[in-house]
Amino acid sequence: KTYVKKIYKNEKIQFGDRNYTWCYGDLVMMQTFYNAALIIQNESYKKICLEFFEAINIKYRKLLSPTLCHGNSGVLLQLLHFRKIHRPRNVNLAFFNVIKDYKESYIYKFRDCEKYDGRRYYLDKNNLLTGSLGIYYAIDLYFGLEDHVGLLNLIM
């Protein structure tokens, strides 16, 4: 089955437990599919994507990390980007799920959480994808700061 047929068949949405992370997640895949639908001017595909965006129900406890790549700030970044298409109702919830991981005692105020062999490791990082830089970038955009270099368009 194709990706779209797995989530949409017989005119019924088949959304299940989705992976909403930025890297290899369903939101980015559907954004790509939506952009393709716009290019080929396929209203049926566009409708599928918009219904997917409306059905987003993110279970944040599954996301261990606040980071952009595989954590809560990546979800926030995607939802902020989707504002161009529609008004996602989960933007504020996504923001609060990033902020809950803020700790004054951490070097960069946020820590990446990696899981290996059933154990969790918390790491102080300051890079874009798995560190505090990406988290602060998403928070800045949430508060309306301008993306002067167009990074959002590059990574989305």
Spell out what each predicted region is.
Residues 62-94:
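Loop/turn-rich, solvent-exposed surfaces of beta-rich toroidal or solenoidal domains
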Residues 29, 75-76, 135:
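Hydrophobic strand positions within the blades of repeat-based beta-sheet folds
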Residues 32-35, 39-43, 51, 55, ...:
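Terminal, non-catalytic domain-edge segments
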